[in-house]
């Protein structure tokens, strides 16, 4: 499976405006775009002129799925551009403590990694969306097979953190949960732009394209 040249899942995009919304979009979505908040790329089949995006609000239930014209993109922030950032508001939250603790072991892997989810949104926008019970969502780019022993060691490292860590391995087949791969399951769920796949090896191209 070839890597997409344009925006990829978990990228944050700037440039979407209320004018790009359908008439039935919720008022809070329009307000978020007026405020200049980024939108996040979601998984969906490729479209030549648009990218599937999600808009988030301050409330947990405020999530909206839509489409953004590719021509409207003014800036693209990938998850790995956020890993070394500090939040604009220095709040002593478990997720931020975990991020600081994990930078060294993640950097030591020699692979690109970054922050996604609410933490990534807050790092990119400066809007405080995390709370004391928030998870820390991470992405690790693994274009080549990631040894299960390494995955298990990383998972054990996460268990020492003050909050739940949800790391996704970005493989040729799509996103795979680190926990599933580390636990040695015979097949793991790979989330790609099309339907999710249960695969023995998400790095084996023949299996991915079958």
From Swiss-Prot:
<dbReference type="GO" id="GO:0016779">
    <property type="term" value="F:nucleotidyltransferase activity"/>
</dbReference>
<dbReference type="Pfam" id="PF10620">
    <property type="entry name" value="MdcG"/>
</dbReference>
<dbReference type="InterPro" id="IPR048903">
    <property type="entry name" value="MdcG_N"/>
</dbReference>
<keyword id="KW-0548">Nucleotidyltransferase</keyword>
<dbReference type="InterPro" id="IPR049180">
    <property type="entry name" value="MdcG_C"/>
</dbReference>
<feature type="active site">
    <location>
        <position position="135"/>
    </location>
</feature>
<protein>
    <recommendedName>
        <fullName>Phosphoribosyl-dephospho-CoA transferase</fullName>
        <ecNumber>2.7.7.66</ecNumber>
    </recommendedName>
</protein>
<dbReference type="Pfam" id="PF20866">
    <property type="entry name" value="MdcG_N"/>
</dbReference>
<dbReference type="InterPro" id="IPR017557">
    <property type="entry name" value="Holo-ACP_synthase"/>
</dbReference>
<comment type="similarity">
    <text>Belongs to the MdcG family.</text>
</comment>
<keyword id="KW-0808">Transferase</keyword>
<feature type="active site">
    <location>
        <position position="137"/>
    </location>
</feature>
<comment type="function">
    <text>Transfers 2'-(5-triphosphoribosyl)-3'-dephosphocoenzyme-A to the apo-[acyl-carrier-protein] of the malonate decarboxylase to yield holo-[acyl-carrier-protein].</text>
</comment>
